[in-house]
Structures are given as C-alpha cells and as structure tokens.
Amino acid sequence: MTLSRDSLEWAIEFVSDHSDGDLFPKIIEINAVKEKSDLFINAVEGKDLSLFTPKPCRRFIVPKDEISYRQATQLHPQDSLLLSALIYQFGQGIEDRRLEKDRVFSYRVLPTLSDGLYSNKKAWNEFWQKANRLASTASCILYLDIADFYNQIYHHTVENQLIASGFPNQAIKWVISLLESTTAGVSRGVPIGPHPIHLIAESTLIPIDNSLESSGFNFIRFADDILIFCNSEKEAKSNLATVASVLDKQQRLMLQRHKTKIYKPGEFRTLCAEMVEDRPIDREEARLLGIIRRYTGGNPYQTISYNSISDSDWSQFSTEVVSKIINEYLSQDDVDYIRLRWFYRRLAQVGHPGAIDVSLEKLDSLGPCLANICFYISSIQNIEPEQWKNIGSKLLQLLEADEVKENEFFRLSILSLFSRNEYINHFAHLSKIFNSSDSFARREIMLSAFQNRAIDWLREHKESFSNMDNWQRLAFVFCASAFPKDEKKYFINRFDYDGPFEEVLSKWVKSI
C-alpha cells in the first residue's frame, strides 16, 4: 500500500488552505513546501509508509472555559500531510460503515478543497434542530456525554475499526505509530486538534452506535453527545443503564456524571434553542451577522475583502457596537464561550478592527477565546501601520500578564501574531527575551525576525542550529531563505535533513 499522487496533492492544498486544526497558528513552512509540492509528492508517492517515522508533536494546555482545560496537540507538518492524505484516500471506508446522516451528525466525510474534509458545516445546528423535532413525540429525553472521550480511546479499538473499514495494513500500522508518538507509548488516547483525527475517533463509535440501534433506541448522536428519546422516565433510566453497560463492556468508556440528565420535553426544547450556534445575543449582533451572510452566502470560510464591502456596511462594525456585543456576552453569569468563539470567527470573515480594544483589554476574561481572537487580529484589514504598532505594544504588555506567563498556549498565540504581520514590528523587544524563552516561543521569535528583516540577528544563531529541536529547525531553515544566495546555499548544504518535509523545505530555501 502506498499513498497516491491525488491524495498527496489534496492534502497539501487542504493543510495550506485550512491549516492542520482549529486551535493553533498555521505552520508557515507549509506554504514553502506547497511551492515545491512535486518534490514532496515524488518523495512520498509509492513509498513504504514505514519509512516516514512520526515526528515530535507539540502539546499545550488549552482553556475550554473559565475553569476547565484540555490538552491539545499539533502534529509535525509532515505528519499532518501524511495523515490528511491517508484519510482522503481511505476515509470513505469508515464513512460507509456509519449510520445514516440524520442519526449520526458529526464529521461526515466529503472532502473538498473549499470545505475541507467534512461535508456539513451546519451539522451542530441540524443536530439540535432534529432533537427539537424528536422531543415533540417523546415523554422524556435522556442526554448523555462520554467522559473525556478522545483521551480514553484505545489504540487497539482504532486498529480494529480501521481493519473493518478496509484500511491497508501498512496504513493502519502508521496511524497507530502516530497515535503512540503523541501519547509517549501509552496505548490509549488520540490527539485533540488535528482535523483528520475526528474521523478516526468517529470510527471507534461505530460499534456503540450499532449496539444502540440493535437495542431499539430512538437516538441521535453528535461526537460524544448522545440523545435518546424515551416514552417514560422508567424507560429513560433503563436506557441509561444499558448505555453505561455497552460503553464499559465494549471500550471501558464512562459517562460524564454532571452532563447526564433526563429532561422533560419543554425543558429540553429550551436547551435545544440554547445550543444552536447562530443565536444572536441582541439585535445589533443579528444585524452584523446578517451583513456577513449577505456577502459570504453563509459560507463560514469565505472572507470579505475591504474593497468589496460598501462603506455603509463597513461602518456598522464600529468599535462601540462590537464592544457592546462582546461585553454583553461577558456580563452573563455563565459565559457562553462556544457562542462567543463563533462570533469571533464571524468577525474574522469581515476583518473589521472594531473588536481589537475590547479583546485586548478583557483578555483575562476571554482566555477560552484566545485562539479565535488571534485569528481575528490576523485577519484585520484597512488600518494604518502606526495602529498596528500600537496593537503590538498592547500585545507585549499582555505577555507580561500573570495569566499569560503561566500558560504556554497563550504565549504561543500572542507571539504568533508578531511572526505573521510586519507592521506589528517590536522585534527589538522580542530579541531581548529570546534566550530566556521556551522552545516554542523561540520558534515564533525567529519567524518574527524573518518577518521584520532582522537578518543579521538570525545569522548570529546559525551556530546553534544543531542544538535546535525539530520545530525550531523548521523555522530556522525557513528563515535562512532571507540570507544572501551563496550564504544560504553553504549553510543548507552543511546539514542533513530528516524526512521529505525538511528536505523539500531546504531545497525551497536554496531555490529562491
């Protein structure tokens, strides 16, 4: 078994356009490899996958809300490309074994370059809309949530499901070796973050879904959320015991106690309304979302260029209006961070600077939205360079805040902005904190040096290249493209490169 050219071509375009996940800054080196995609494809196509040993990933503790966290993983870009190609090439085998799409709503595979791996971006809303309809004919609704699902998935279960889905043996072995590389050899847990992992996680629930269907349950599911529609409270309690037994016997999974609940129809329909993402907090948010939909046609990935939006529509996204909306979310006793993150993603589509001030001023309350805030800031258009400089000053102040100092993910997210926008230039400050910074921060500071043309500073770090970790090496090789032609050629030729991604990146550096 080998990866096909079509799969590899698609994977390169996919990761370049959609990044490797929703939580981390895009790996900038992907663009360089994309320019030399034929070299990467030729190095992988037709080759034994065992030749490509999984590389070190990055793991960070990421906030879910004010008091809970999850561990998120970013795969090495080579592994992201290979895994994406594998799922593109063989993922339909998993999809064909799943229950119908109006029973299991999450992560239905239909790879396209415009939408990514999964077909329906409105699946979450449709799940709750279907739940609302089913509740009208039920006496009780049982709401179940599998506890810590991704971290509890056994690799042996993944292996069995990939076999049943027709994955070639070599592909299965590579996937399992990748999973083990992210868990320090422990045979349990899959990484949270990478797009293709969602389908692998879904594959492990196929036996659970089949068992619930065989038991005659009227249920629907989205990822680890299961809803069962019952005729009585007695039936709901009996079904609860059955599901708990199925999860335990099949995969030693458990239900999350605080989210397990039996609802009456009226109470449940209120919950359904609360769970739908597109539910504006006030009329002003509804008006802004209407403007965005008018220009994007409802496509959550389409951006609106400043030149295409009318002056009157642009003016609606004022600092006063946007700040009021965000403050209204934050004033709630139980802040709806899921909905607030969704709002920031919509703001990123239009790129209006109206949310900058409130976002930076209220970061202590907006921690669970930080990745979305940074993505929003990187999308901002039509402001003067001097304003970017002021934004950079505020970001540097945030780096000194206690809540940022104590969280690697916060620091990574903030520093990544300096490496992607030349106008935020505060490199003189960043260079002073380089030696005392963590490895991941050094990577972003090196990329910031490249962005701000601090070539002489980069040159001073050539001697430490051999001691850099994999992620720093990638960044420094990329940055070496700014050296004079003879210098970068001599530097690149001094070292060996591990794997097709590094090799192609080094060839790109010498070619420009």
Named regions from a protein language model:
Residues R269-R283:
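Short, low-order "capping/linker" segments at domain edges
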Residues K64-E66, K259, K264-G266:
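A general secondary-structure junction signal
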